[in-house]
Amino acid sequence: MSAPPRQKRLTPTTIAALKHQRPIVSLTAYTTPMARLMDAHCDLLLVGDSLGMVLYGLDTTVGVTLEMMIAHGQAVLRGVNRACVIIDMPFGSYQESREQAFRNAARIMKETGCDGIKLEGGTEMAETVAFLVERGIPVLGHVGLMPQQVNTSGGYRSKGHDEAEADKIRADATAIAKAGAFALVIEGTVEPLAREITQTLSVPTIGIGASPACDGQILVSDDMLGLFNDFKPRFVKHYAELAGVISKAVEDYATEVKARQFPGPEHTFQPRKS
């Protein structure tokens, strides 16, 4: 007997066609259980290199490896039936040359079954984006605040405050769109500029710390769920406060274990009566 047919997932082409139709709903996903919970509600799930900070406790995304991205991409794809799944290319896996970028992007797609890759960069990456797209690899661009470049760009600060910086972001967005990216993430960019870019480009923009006028929005799922209490970026809204819920659950568990209240009779196995 053959396996039941898998529901057809949304594709980069589907996502691109949503511009001027309705907002694109996107979140990051790193594991199978979370992907299953998000799948019905999200158009696009990004296996972001933010996993280095969220799951592994790294200070930046620079330490994330290709192997980490592939492993988590495989996990997410196991939990998805509907959403388009895009995987971040980690720092150092695509900047050296167009050939390096294609080799690693092709590996990601082959080993995970994802729908495309995301890479950071502007005018300097346009030729690479075109090279990938021409060879069958859908690309989600990323301009504005680029986390992989925090060591050379002044850290995690919003972009586009002065005209020179704004002009650079405009040029970056235009170049990546013209190179063939199916959509573009705009991160940490002043609202009027993100709005202007969205209205100018023919491809969808997905904002994070950008503008409500963007064609879609994305957040780091762990931020949105309130799993971190020590720092909350300005652009994050907590739709839940799971850090407190989890902490209380663990506290209650510990209390019951110490008091020998858990496991109770309903949680243990008794011999069958003959």
From Swiss-Prot:
Residues where 3-methyl-2-oxobutanoate binds: 49-50, 88, 118
EC number: 2.1.2.11
Keyword Cytoplasm: yes
Residues annotated for Mg(2+) binding in this entry: 49, 88, 120
GO molecular function, one term: 3-methyl-2-oxobutanoate hydroxymethyltransferase activity
Note accompanying the cofactor annotation: Binds 1 Mg(2+) ion per subunit.
GO CC annotation terms, alphabetical: cytoplasm
Lipid metabolism found in the keyword field: no
Annotated transmembrane regions: none
Pfam families xref list: Pantoate_transf
Active site: 187
Enzyme class: transferase
Keywords associated with the record: Cytoplasm, Magnesium, Metal-binding, Pantothenate biosynthesis, Transferase
Alphabetized CDD domains for the sequence: KPHMT-like
GO biological process: pantothenate biosynthetic process
Pathway annotation from the record: Cofactor biosynthesis; (R)-pantothenate biosynthesis; (R)-pantoate from 3-methyl-2-oxobutanoate: step 1/2
Classification via Gene3D superfamilies: Phosphoenolpyruvate-binding domains
Subunit structure as annotated in this protein's UniProt entry: Homodecamer; pentamer of dimers.
Function comment: Catalyzes the reversible reaction in which hydroxymethyl group from 5,10-methylenetetrahydrofolate is transferred onto alpha-ketoisovalerate to form ketopantoate.
Recorded family membership: Belongs to the PanB family.
HAMAP family: PanB
Name used for this protein in its record: 3-methyl-2-oxobutanoate hydroxymethyltransferase
Organism: Allorhizobium ampelinum (strain ATCC BAA-846 / DSM 112012 / S4)
